[in-house]
């Protein structure tokens, strides 16, 4: 059995689903209350931090709750998590996936396969190989962007407790798209255009993506589309932030027009 298959698999990018070591996906109805899912997702999101006290978790997840209802909801949700992810655990045995020390809680990462962790590892390996072996770098970066199916925890888009992690993952994914597009620019400008377009679907204000797209169109001999790309970049930046493109982008436009 592969390492991934023997672990609890958690998918957070563009979806939220959990696959048990038995290969079966945990159904939505099995989780019961939404607060059970919220607590598990919170523990996933904060897994790289130190263990958090129960009161800290409650105040971040359900700030509107009083102490009594918060304690009750936490207890019910934690019981629900253990019941769903370790259905065969006896009541007296220690939980495999959640480390509890007194009133602090943390996920046991060594027993989990999490797509966003794998994405980050592949991006790091791609960046490490960038200068010595661009071919290997491209392989890792392609694997990473293929794993990125969409926003981190898309069903919690308005939850403050996962906003920072969502933005962090998006930024490193955008950087991976840009690096790949740069690697492809000279040999396959059409692929650079595709990659930069994918980056702009994640964030249509990402100026690096417009710039690479301009360069790629210019290399293909399509100056009108290169200029049109600049105009779109300028329009988006003005609308969203009230700013103009960077000097490097303006200079690229001047160079393209002069050819």
Question: Over which residues does each language-model region extend?
Answer:
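Short amphipathic alpha-helical recognition elements used for nucleic-acid or partner binding
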Residues: 27-61, 81, 205-206, 210-211
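Short N-terminal amphipathic alpha-helices
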Residues: 50-56, 68-74, 92-97
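Short boundary/linker motifs that mark transitions into or out of structured domains
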Residues: 1-39, 96-104, 111, 150
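Conserved amphipathic alpha-helical interaction elements at protein-protein interfaces in regulatory
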Residues: 45-46, 63, 87, 239
């Amino acid at each position: 059995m592969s390492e991934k298959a023997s672990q609890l698999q958690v998918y957070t990018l563009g979806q939220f689903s959990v696959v048990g070591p038995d290969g079966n996906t945990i159904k939505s109805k099995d989780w019961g209350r939404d607060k059970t899912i919220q607590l598990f997702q919170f523990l996933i999101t904060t897994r790289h931090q130190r263990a958090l006290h129960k009161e800290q978790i409650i105040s971040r997840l359900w700030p509107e709750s009083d102490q009594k209802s918060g304690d009750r909801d936490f207890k019910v949700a934690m019981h629900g998590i253990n019941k769903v992810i370790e259905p065969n655990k006896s009541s007296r045995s220690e939980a495999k996936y959640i480390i509890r020390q007194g009133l602090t809680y943390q996920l046991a990462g060594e027993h989990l396969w999490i797509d966003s962790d794998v994405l980050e590892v592949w991006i790091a390996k791609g960046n490490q190989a960038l200068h010595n072996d661009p071919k290997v770098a491209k392989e890792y970066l392609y694997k990473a962007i293929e794993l990125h199916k969409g926003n981190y925890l898309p069903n919690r888009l308005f939850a403050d407790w996962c906003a920072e992690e969502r933005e962090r993952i998006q930024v490193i994914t955008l950087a991976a798209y840009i690096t790949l597009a740069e690697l492809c620019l000279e040999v396959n400008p059409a692929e650079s255009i595709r990659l930069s377009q994918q980056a702009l679907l994640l964030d249509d204000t990402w100026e690096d993506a417009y710039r690479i797209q301009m360069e790629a169109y210019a290399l293909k001999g399509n100056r009108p589309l290169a200029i049109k790309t600049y105009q779109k970049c300028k329009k988006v930046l003005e609308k969203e932030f009230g700013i103009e493109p960077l000097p490097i982008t303006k200079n690229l436009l001047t160079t393209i027009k002069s050819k």
